Curated annotation (Swiss-Prot):
Cofactor: Zn(2+)
Keywords of this entry: Cytoplasm, Endonuclease, Hydrolase, Metal-binding, Nuclease, Nucleus, tRNA processing, Zinc
Superkingdom in the source lineage: Eukaryota
Compartments where found: Cytoplasm, Cytosol; Nucleus
Biological process according to GO: rescue of stalled ribosome; tRNA 3'-end processing
Catalysed reactions, as listed in the record: Endonucleolytic cleavage of RNA, removing extra 3' nucleotides from tRNA precursor, generating 3' termini of tRNAs. A 3'-hydroxy group is left at the tRNA terminus and a 5'-phosphoryl group is left at the trailer molecule
Organism field: Homo sapiens
Protein name in the entry: Zinc phosphodiesterase ELAC protein 1
Location of the active site: 66 (proton acceptor)
EC number: 3.1.26.11
EC class: hydrolase
GO molecular function, one term: tRNA-specific ribonuclease activity
């Protein structure tokens, strides 16, 4: 199963001609999951090879405008492009408490009627995710007058034992959220692909006398088969080792993680996407505003033993490599060096708009 990540917006605070506001798409076999939806995300989608109509899930890390102000417009555009296709499955939206009310208000005030259904699942933050004076209590409201296309979502509480939030667990993936520290409650997301059955051992099948055909499919799917001679063949008799799934972790704005949930969920991630708003020389300023530097991001990646670190959410002062001036000592290339110095020169990737990173199947 193919899997890749496309960066639609890699800039902080606001969209610019060189970097869009925060938005990342994880694509699995054509289905797209959107992580954050800053202003202008739908325009970035149109410039990419992705299709907005393929989006089935949306994850919002926190309620700062550069991470979710593009959401109402995107939903409207998907609706317009859907025509009368009312059979479309509901779009699942995950984010902090208050997100459902925001979507409801914008749809109500703009008299918008979507042609598809959507459902908002809200994560309830804890008080230690932001400075005390910035914490606002948003009640999860179950309205009788909800928009006609909105289905009832869940209120998701922290699992205190796991130190994480279980968003969903299906046949292919387990997706969880973990707490981050920022000026307002922020979250990171861990997407883990489940193990898949190993390949059939052709030689063993032959030796055991299993005839080619339907029996192969059953064994591949974990079902035992009985041969004509009465011998039962179990899947473990003929299957090679299971294929370990891939892990992608995407963090919202933060100056650190809260609890050990983030470290556990991001451990040995195949791809870790972490913000690095400012360079290391401005670490105090970054922390003051709830942000990270390359050194901070790399330190977390090293703690998690992440296999690949990608930095994003750069201050708009840091232009993409192709636009950087020759001889600059405080440009984007310096951020790469700062992160790599922590990771013993392990290569670090600097995200740019429309960059696509493939996550290959593990051998």
């Amino acid at each position: 199963m193919s899997m890749d990540v496309t960066f639609l917006g890699t800039g902080a605070a606001y969209p610019s001609p060189t970097r869009g506001a925060s938005a990342v798409v994880l694509r699995c076999e054509g289905e797209c999951w959107l992580f954050d939806c800053g202003e202008g995300t739908q325009t970035q989608l149109m410039k990419s090879q992705l299709k907005a109509g393929r989006i089935t899930k949306i994850f919002i890390t926190h309620l700062h405008g550069d991470h979710f102000f593009g959401l109402p417009g995107l939903l409207c555009t998907i609706s317009l492009q859907s025509g009368s296709m009312v059979s479309k499955q509901p779009i699942e939206i995950y984010g902090p408490v208050g997100l459902r009310d925001f979507i409801w208000r914008t749809m109500e005030l703009s008299h918008t009627e979507l042609v598809f259904h959507y459902v908002v699942h809200e994560l309830v933050p804890t008080a230690d995710q932001c400075p005390a004076e910035e914490l606002k209590e948003f009640a999860h409201v179950n309205r009788a007058d909800s928009p006609p296309k909105e289905e009832q979502g869940r209120t998701i509480l922290l699992d205190s034992e796991e130190n994480s939030y279980l968003l969903f667990d299906d046949e292919q993936f387990v997706v969880k959220a973990f707490r981050l520290f920022h000026r307002i409650p922020s979250f990171g997301f861990s997407v883990v692909e489940k193990k898949r059955p190993g390949k059939l051992n052709a030689q063993k099948l032959k030796d055991l006398g299993v005839p080619p055909g339907p029996a192969y499919g059953k064994l591949k799917n974990g079902i035992s088969v009985v041969l004509e001679n009465g011998v039962t063949i179990s899947p473990q008799d003929v299957l090679k080792k299971p294929i370990v799934g891939r892990k992608i972790c995407i963090l919202g704005d933060c100056s650190g993680v809260v609890g050990d949930g983030g470290v556990k969920l991001c451990f040995e991630a195949d791809l870790l996407i972490h913000e690095a708003t400012l360079d290391d020389a401005q670490m105090d300023k970054a922390k003051e505003h709830g942000h990270s530097t390359p050194q901070m991001a790399a330190t977390f990646a090293k703690l998690c033993r992440a296999k690949r670190l990608v930095l994003t959410h750069f201050s708009q002062r840091y232009k993409p490599v192709a636009l950087a001036r020759e001889g600059e000592t405080d440009g984007i290339a310096e951020l790469k060096k700062q992160a790599e110095s922590v990771l013993d020169l392990q290569e670090v990737t600097l995200a740019e708009d429309f960059m696509v990173i493939s996550i290959p199947i593990k051998k």
